[in-house]
A protein has these predicted regions:
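Zinc-dependent deaminase catalytic domain
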Residues: 12, 20-183
């Protein structure tokens, strides 16, 4: 109390104004102490939430996927799945993989995967993703896993499973840490 009072009085304000300021500060401090503590998300949760927002840009009719590369707590690039630049999007022409089981026949799909788009953005802008962490809404497929390995990504954090155990095996064999976060 005395320290606050001394600080306010050092501004040489009118004594009545000083008293009002002191009372205001003390009541705000008491109010803050009574507030419930704020639960701050961990970094994996924080960056995964951003990947979820990135996925909302997707035009895929089957799955909206988002990805981002992070290094030293800084976002390097983002990507979402969709048709290559200049081509019609799936939400306009329809899904080429309609009726095809999930995790199979990737070659039929014209879309670029979220992870691939994030890598392309890094390459286009001269950003190294070596040693970075990939946050993606879905587990990477085998094609994207091979790209992560060659790009020397350090860690992959994903939310939703994808029916491609080989991709996970490849990542682990390459020494890339793989973490699935809970919803």
């Amino acid at each position: 109390r005395n320290r606050c009072k001394e600080e306010i009085l050092s501004f040489r304000c009118h004594p009545l104004r000083a008293r009002s300021l002191i009372e205001s500060l003390l009541s705000k401090r008491a109010a803050i102490q009574l507030m419930p503590s704020i639960e701050r998300p961990g970094l994996d949760e924080y960056f995964m939430e951003i990947a979820i927002v990135v996925a909302k840009r997707s035009t895929c009719l089957r799955n909206q996927m988002g990805a981002l590369f992070v290094k030293n707590k800084r976002i390097l690039t983002t990507g979402y799945n969709g048709a290559p630049a200049g081509l019609e999007h799936c939400d306009v022409v329809g899904c080429a993989r309609e009726g095809v089981p999930s995790g199979t026949r990737h070659e039929l799909c014209p879309a670029v995967h979220a992870e691939q788009n994030a890598i392309i953005q890094a390459a286009m802008h001269g950003i190294s993703i070596e040693g970075a962490t990939l946050y993606c809404t879905h587990q990477p497929c085998i094609l994207c896993a091979k790209m992560m390995i060659n790009a020397r990504v350090a860690k992959v954090v994903y939310l939703h499973c994808y029916p491609d155990q080989t991709a996970l095996d490849f990542l682990e064999q390459a020494g890339i840490e793989v973490v699935r976060v809970e919803e």
